[in-house]
């Protein structure tokens, strides 16, 4: 009898706005939930003799920055994330947006999306 194992959560996160308490809370919560889900799936897959390797979180950034202190909480969560986080600048990555961009485990950008510190 074949066992159907659950699939992981969606991994695309978006920051198309100013950095503020609300936007940082959304991203922080999403990263924590994905990490919790991946930890559960690793254990569940192991019970069935299958190795579970989580796919990276893709965080798309288009932000002119904003509240630095609220940003620090997200940066800490990103740093401790067991699931790799790939940050991609799609438009602007300025001020806090730049700090988020460089905190990704891997960093990417489109050719017409220069970051600004």
Model regions and ranges:
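Terminal-region recognition feature
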Residues: 1-117
């Amino acid at each position: 009898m074949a066992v159907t194992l659950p699939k992981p959560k969606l991994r695309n996160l978006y920051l198309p706005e100013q950095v503020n308490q609300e936007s940082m809370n959304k991203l922080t919560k999403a990263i924590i939930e994905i990490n919790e889900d991946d930890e559960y799936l690793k254990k569940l897959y192991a019970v069935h003799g299958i190795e579970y390797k989580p796919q990276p979180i893709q965080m798309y950034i288009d932000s002119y920055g904003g509240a630095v202190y609220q940003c620090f909480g997200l940066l800490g969560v990103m740093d401790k994330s067991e699931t790799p986080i790939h940050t991609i600048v799609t438009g602007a990555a300025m001020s806090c947006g730049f700090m988020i961009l460089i905190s990704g485990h891997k960093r990417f950008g489109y050719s017409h999306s220069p970051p600004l510190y």
